[in-house]
């Protein structure tokens, strides 16, 4: 049984908790969030601020971590701030997800219920492949990406670091979604999208630039 600590106790964290409970090989060991000011042991799991990582590892040496925060930029900041190595993070896949044996999934990534990851897809670290999302064959998905529920990437799509593909959006084959860009919900992407823009509509068009650095 793998002991899992999640960092983040918002709505996304609730879903991660249920995913952990849905698996037969994981148990929730701790919830770390800034709203907890002190490190304490509860009836079922420990709670504390993110800085309690060191104390938690002393008590549970084999504990593995997952950053349960939906915001891509904040997730990157936490991954860098916690001072943990790649082997300290767990990859969580819901039992109902379908993942090709040839797919490669990075550390700290979560694959939610009903998601589909097809042949030779490559998914980076600390990504969220949300409920019912589809990453088709030969997709290249970089670190800190979020595919929202029912987002669909056709074959050989590339999604660069920190990009967010909105709920129900669809992307045709061989498109590139630029780093830290946002694709609006329900959009149909038929042309590649550059870095740090918001695109929406069917077909998707650039509607604004994103000025923040998102470098963590």
UniProtKB/Swiss-Prot annotation:
CDD domains: LbH_AT_putative (cd03360). Changing residue 146 to L: Loss of activity. Affects the oligomeric state. Keywords: Acyltransferase, Repeat, Transferase. Induction: Repressed by SinR. GO terms for molecular function: acyltransferase activity. The active site is at residue 137. Pfam families: Hexapep, PglD_N. It catalyses: UDP-N-acetylbacillosamine + acetyl-CoA = UDP-N,N'-diacetylbacillosamine + CoA + H(+). The keyword Acyltransferase applies. InterPro entries: AcTrfase_PglD-like (IPR020019), Hexapep (IPR001451), Hexapep_transf_CS (IPR018357), PglD_N (IPR041561), Trans_hexapeptide_repeat (IPR050179), Trimer_LpxA-like_sf (IPR011004). Its EC number is 2.3.1.203. Disruption phenotype: Insertion mutant shows decreased efficiency of biofilm formation. Disruption affects swarming motility. It comes from the Bacteria. Acetyl-CoA binds at residue 146. Forms oligomers. Belongs to the transferase hexapeptide repeat family. Catalyzes the conversion of UDP-2,4,6-trideoxy-2-acetamido-4-amino glucose to UDP-2,4,6-trideoxy-2,4-diacetamido glucose, commonly known as UDP-N,N'-diacetylbacillosamine (UDP-diNAcBac). This is UDP-N-acetylbacillosamine N-acetyltransferase. It comes from Bacillus subtilis (strain 168). The lineage of its organism: Bacteria, Bacillati, Bacillota, Bacilli, Bacillales.
């Amino acid at each position: 049984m793998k002991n899992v600590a999640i960092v983040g106790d918002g709505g996304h964290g609730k879903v991660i908790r249920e995913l952990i409970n849905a698996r037969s090989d994981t148990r929730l060991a701790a919830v770390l969030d800034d709203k907890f000011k002190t490190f304490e042991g509860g009836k079922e799991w420990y709670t504390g601020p993110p800085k309690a990582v060191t104390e938690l590892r002393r008590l549970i040496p084999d504990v593995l971590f997952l950053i349960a925060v939906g915001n891509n930029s904040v997730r990157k900041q936490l991954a860098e701030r916690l001072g943990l190595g790649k082997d300290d993070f767990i990859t969580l896949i819901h039992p109902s997800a379908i993942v090709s044996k040839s797919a490669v999934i990075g550390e700290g990534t979560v694959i939610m219920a009903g998601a589909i990851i097809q042949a030779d897809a490559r998914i980076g670290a600390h990504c969220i492949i949300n409920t019912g999302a589809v990453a088709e064959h030969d997709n290249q998905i970089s670190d800190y990406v979020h595919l929202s529920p029912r987002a669909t990437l056709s074959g050989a799509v590339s999604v660069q670091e920190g990009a967010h593909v909105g709920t129900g959006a669809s992307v045709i084959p061989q498109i590139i979604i630029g780093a830290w860009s946002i694709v609006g919900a329900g959009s149909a992407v038929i042309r590649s999208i550059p870095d740090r823009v918001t695109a929406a509509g069917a077909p998707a068009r650039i509607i604004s630039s994103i000025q923040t650095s998102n470098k963590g």
